[in-house]
Regions:
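Catalytic-core region of carbohydrate-active enzymes that cleave or remodel glycosidic bonds
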Residues: 274-301, 324-376, 386-387
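Solvent-exposed loop and edge beta-strand segments that line ligand/cofactor-binding
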Residues: 3-6, 60-77, 128-141, 174-189, ...
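Well-ordered alpha-helical scaffold segments within catalytic/enzyme domains
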Residues: 21, 81-94, 143-158, 192-205, ...
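Beta-strand-rich binding/interaction modules
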Residues: 478-499
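Low-complexity, Ser/Thr/Pro/Gly-enriched N-terminal "stalk/linker" regions
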Residues: 1-76, 101-121
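Extended ligand-binding groove/face enriched in aromatic
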Residues: 58-72, 78, 87-190, 194-251
Length: 647
């Protein structure tokens, strides 16, 4: 039997003051969110039109016009509203809140009397509601709107959007299920499941938990459900999804019987996020065991070193074990965000540092690589190798442009990244009655109810420096509790001191946390020194794309080589195994502040022999190479880039 062993503390209990993420949050709150707001209102020229606000006005009857955009365009606005809710918790903004309230009023006017809410089917094809669960994303949009409703209520105390979402989910509950008179359908794109669990936890209404359980349990019962639906209907807005195998939508077998991550990577992450939450709520060990197996398969065989998941453009999907191509990697930003959701739920159910290690990898690498440093351009995909001008993908899609752009036709990633970064404080700490867990070394202060009330301040220069200090302020002197500090998987040596006195290594648990149990006095300090030397990292021998190659890592940061620093044709470079890796001083004026690495390498001379093939190996010259953090690449113009270098 399992249960939630710990719970992440509320965003309102955390104040981030961090040398790295304070800048990121400031950019998101003061630049990215306003920029996205203008995009949603179609006020930014030279980019893809959104039309989402106009779609709601048309659906509400406020103006005449024709629906424009993807069938799931509503979700862009929902995710932006959710990000706004978190930003209001981080930093009050009455003007932004008033504009969000006006948008919520608009959403309420668009909602139908029976609770239905989807602007495409309200404005364009009302006769076809709920006829294409495969790819028309009505429940996907409902899920994102529900997440926004919960977040906005928790941030502001206002219930209007929450009430709209309850009415919407009640409508879905009346329609779907195994009871007589209901439809035994499931959504093609998971999202409603995790949203229903959040709605249940916010309202206490059991029907929402039961509906989430129905959608999770029903998936995979009939692997041909979506194909049967396609064959039965005479109408379809698109038949793209109709051709996908059941595994694409994780419908190939019941969730409890699945043991590998399959299909569309984002859908899979959203499903597993909901499944772990449900398993912990229901004490469902069988469901939890399946989630653990899929986590292990993902991390051990199907994840890029940057945290990216999804190896192929076709279906934005997982493929097979160890298939991790670099120049055609998909590694969608939304998928990396989804891994964070999954990891957070796994940590609540089982506070094991291996889940926090992946969460950390994502927030410092695979997620924020999706945003330009100024917050106004975005990557949909996150390749590990870029060769501008080369036809590395056969599809010609804008997602594969090796340069961030201002918006996308399918703009799911920009607001998804915004809601993750504005809610980051809720990923750092969790607590139980007698234990406080420090999962991420993100600086700031946090308040806990543990042991009668505790406040902890964390200070550091992380991720550029491995020194971290906790200052503990219990409300009651002598309060007894355990402070659990993560021992990162990348760290080979970590020293922990309490009030300057070394702590015995015996307190480190097999789940990767230093368990510091004591009677705490106001002003007690815990200082951690983590060895942070640059390291070479090698892929599993079965990863064909990385054979004979090496990547560089320092602390939680994965590094990459850009043409800006090292010239083009990065494939002609190699890093000898004996070459020493030098850590350069922190450069505040480079890429908003980074620590770069320098290493002596070799470059093959290409002009000596012009023959395409020759008997003699190319001559080499010694060169000095510089590596920068992967997340910061492509912020100095379109350029060549490579994470895995020949050795």
């Amino acid at each position: 039997m399992i249960k939630k062993e710990t719970s992440f503390i509320d965003l309102k209990q955390v104040k981030i003051d961090d040398p790295f993420f304070s800048r990121v949050q400031n950019v998101v709150i003061h630049t990215m969110l306003p920029y996205q707001e203008r995009v949603l209102h179609d006020e930014v020229s030279g980019i893809r039109k959104s039309h989402v606000i106009k779609n709601f006005r048309i659906a509400a009857g406020d103006e005449k016009g024709t629906y424009y955009g993807r069938v799931f365009q509503d979700s862009d606005l929902a995710k932006w509203l959710e990000a706004v809710a978190y930003s209001l918790t981080v930093e009050a903004n009455p003007e932004l809140e008033a504009r969000a309230d006006a948008i919520i009023d608009l959403i309420g006017r668009a909602q139908q009397p029976d609770g239905y809410l989807d602007t495409y089917f309200i404005a364009a094809e009302p006769e076809h509601k709920w006829q294409n669960l495969t790819d028309c994303h009505e429940m996907y949009c409902a899920g994102h709107m529900t997440e926004a409703g919960v977040a906005y209520y928790q941030a502001t105390g206002k219930t209007k959007l929450l009430d709209i979402c309850c009415k919407l989910c009640d409508h879905i509950d009346r329609r779907f299920g195994r009871e007589a008179g209901k439809v035994t359908g499931i959504p093609g794109h998971e999202e409603i499941e995790l949203a229903l669990m959040r709605l249940y936890q916010a309202t206490g209404e059991e029907r929402y938990r039961k509906l989430a359980a129905y959608f999770i349990d029903e998936r995979g019962r009939d692997p041909e459900f979506f194909h049967k639906e396609a064959a039965a209907r005479s109408w379809s807005r698109t038949d793209y999804m109709d051709k996908q195998p059941p595994s694409y939508m994780q419908n190939h077998k019941p969730v409890r019987e699945q043991d590998t991550v399959e299909g569309h990577a984002v859908r899979c992450m959203y499903l597993l996020t909901a499944a772990v939450n449900l398993a912990a709520q229901n004490y469902d060990e069988a469901l939890m065991a399946a989630c653990r197996k899929m986590w292990d398969n993902m991390v051990d065989r199907r994840m890029y070193i940057t945290g990216g998941i999804g190896s192929t453009y076709y279906g934005e999907a997982f493929t097979v074990d160890y298939d991790l191509p670099n120049d055609t990697a998909y590694a969608e930003t939304c998928a990396a965000v989804g891994v964070c959701f999954f990891a957070k739920q796994m940590l609540e159910a089982d506070p094991d540092a291996r889940y926090a290690d992946i969460l950390e990898r994502e927030i410092y690498n695979g997620t924020i690589s999706g945003m330009q440093l100024d917050g106004t351009k975005f990557f949909y995909i996150n390749q590990l190798e870029a060769n501008p001008g080369m036809p590395t993908n056969a599809y010609g899609e804008e997602e594969y442009t090796p340069e961030r752009i201002g918006w996308y036709d399918c703009a799911c990633c920009p607001p998804n990244l915004a809601r993750l970064m504005t809610s980051l404080g809720s990923y750092v700490w969790s607590s139980s009655e007698d234990t406080i867990y420090s999962h991420l070394f993100v600086g700031g202060t946090a308040s806990f109810e543990t042991a009668g009330g505790v406040k902890i301040a964390l200070t550091s220069k992380y991720p550029w420096n491995g020194s971290v200090t906790y200052t503990v302020e219990p409300e009651q002197a002598g309060a007894e509790f355990t402070l659990a500090v993560r021992y990162p998987g990348w760290c080979h040596q970590m020293q922990v001191k309490v009030n300057g006195i070394p702590v015995s290594g015996a307190v480190k648990t097999d789940k990767g946390y230093w368990m510091i149990q004591r009677s705490w006095q106001p002003g007690d300090t815990v200082s951690c020194e983590m060895e942070m030397e640059p390291e070479r990292v090698y892929a599993h021998p079965m990863v064909r794309a990385d054979a004979g190659c090496v990547a560089l890592r320092r602390g939680p940061i994965i590094y990459t080589f850009e043409g800006v620093d090292n010239g083009e044709d990065l494939q002609t470079l190699r890093i000898p195994r004996e070459a020493k890796i030098e850590v350069l001083p922190y450069q505040a004026d480079l890429l908003e502040g980074i620590v770069a690495l320098r290493v002596t390498g070799c470059r093959k001379k290409t002009a000596v022999n012009p023959a395409l093939y020759a008997e003699d190996a190319a001559q080499e010259e010694v060169v000095t190479l510089q590596a920068i953090p992967y997340y910061a690449w492509c912020n100095r113009g379109m350029t060549h880039m490579r994470v895995w270098m020949q050795e």
